């Protein structure tokens, strides 16, 4: 296992290491808000560009949350090699546990990694398996400052968008010009 710290009698944090890959990936697949971006094969594609500082957070020896991240100087990013990279949560986690997870992670990052600031990019809720915005609530309660907001859009595959007349005209022009 990686560097480990006991934050209190219930919470235990382990810094990710390669021997934890299978456990990490299994948790991502069953978490309420993980996506393929958080699978280690995807994250490790840029391993040479970022100093990984991903955290595995345990409650009573049970993996409860993951925090993909990297260090740059004294700043923790969730994660610069990913489009987004917020806290991945167990489907059974409670709001009180999420608060404890954040407090434990902040304590760990300050004490073990000398982190002075955090840049947190939440996982857009449209990608969640189960609604999960506890992280945003807790960050607000902790006094976090919003510095940027990104937009995420989806197209429901089972509800096709109408084909507009203007698009049809442009398509005919493209075909007539041998542009395909």
Segments predicted by a language model, with ranges:
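Conserved alpha/beta cores of soluble small-molecule-handling proteins
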Residues: 109, 115, 143-144
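Structured loops at beta-to-helix junctions and adjacent beta-edge loops in soluble globular domains
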Residues: 16, 70, 90, 123, ...
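Conserved donor-binding loop and adjoining core beta-sheet/short helix segment
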Residues: 12, 26-29, 41-109
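Acyltransferase donor/substrate-recognition loop-hinge adjacent to the catalytic core
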Residues: 1-21, 132-180
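Conserved GNAT acetyl-CoA-binding A-motif
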Residues: 113-124
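Acidic-and-aromatic substrate-binding clefts and catalytic sites of carbohydrate-active enzymes
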Residues: 126-130
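A residue-level signal for conserved active-site and pocket-lining positions in enzyme catalytic cores
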Residues: 24, 120, 174
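Short Pro/Gly-enriched beta-strand edge/turn motifs at strand-loop
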Residues: 34-41
